[in-house]
């Protein structure tokens, strides 16, 4: 069992404590989720004598195992769709980058047969004094058939198998995706009413572009690549293709274009 968390130490005192707002890649490593679920056909021996015998396969079933330790996880139907540990964390990428969610806990249970991630939604309230109740979004799944891929709002801070069970039990708003169906993160978010809108995504990209400073040689190199199909770091021809258009675009970018002198546009991407 392995997990990572931010904030208060779990009751069991285990896990890796992380600073707030760490990237998905850090969570993946510290929560013990930096491995994949691989699969192999089921094989069995026939007419075995000692260690020798004919090996046959059973095409209706497959073995799931860990890519890092090669430890077996389960035997499932060949129609079983696995959800990878990284997919559980990636579910939160746009929510944390655009919608203000913050990952709170994540980890693996039962040797990797079950894993989860939990993010704080930013909603919460204080009940009678200092009793703070926070809103979370939980995504949990298994690879042994014991748990469908389940996304649900909860007020339970999941840090172990017991708290995971409590969070999943009795949730009327849970979205469950059985393993005979492919997990579609965006469809689940839409069902929960938390999908990042096109406008939110656009604003997120615009803010990042406005913060990205661009030097003159970078801009010229980009324009030459796109308009002249010439690498600025290579040998330049005597006459640039589309040179007139290149100069026009350069002038627009450097101040003659409408809006190019705005603080969010001048010298940025």
What label would you give each PLM region?
Residues 59, 112-113, 133-134:
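Short, well-ordered loop/turn elements at secondary-structure boundaries
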């Amino acid at each position: 069992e392995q997990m990572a968390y931010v904030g208060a130490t779990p009751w069991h005192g285990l896990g890796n404590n992380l600073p707030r707002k760490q990237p998905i890649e850090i969570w993946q490593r510290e929560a013990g989720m930096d491995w994949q679920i691989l699969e192999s056909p089921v094989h069995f021996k026939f007419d075995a004598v000692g260690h020798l015998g004919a090996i046959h396969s059973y095409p209706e079933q497959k073995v799931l195992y860990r890519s890092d330790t090669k430890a077996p996880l389960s035997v499932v139907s060949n129609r079983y769709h696995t959800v990878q540990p990284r997919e559980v964390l990636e579910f939160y990428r746009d929510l944390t980058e655009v919608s203000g969610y913050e990952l709170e806990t994540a980890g693996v249970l039962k040797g990797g047969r079950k894993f989860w991630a939990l993010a704080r939604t930013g909603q919460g309230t204080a009940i009678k004094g200092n009793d703070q109740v926070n809103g979370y979004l939980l995504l949990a799944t298994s690879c042994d058939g014991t748990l469908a891929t389940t996304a649900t709002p909860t007020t339970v801070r999941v840090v172990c198998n017991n708290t995971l069970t409590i969070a999943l039990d009795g949730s009327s708003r849970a979205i469950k995706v059985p393993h005979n169906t492919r997990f579609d993160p965006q469809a689940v978010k839409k069902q929960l009413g938390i999908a990042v809108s096109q406008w939110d995504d656009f604003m997120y990209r615009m803010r990042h572009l406005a913060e990205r400073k661009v030097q003159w040689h970078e801009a010229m190199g980009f324009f030459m690549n796109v308009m002249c199909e010439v690498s600025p770091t290579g040998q330049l021809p005597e006459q640039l293709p589309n040179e007139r258009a290149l100069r026009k675009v350069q002038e627009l970018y450097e101040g003659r274009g409408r809006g190019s002198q705005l603080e969010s546009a001048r010298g940025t991407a």
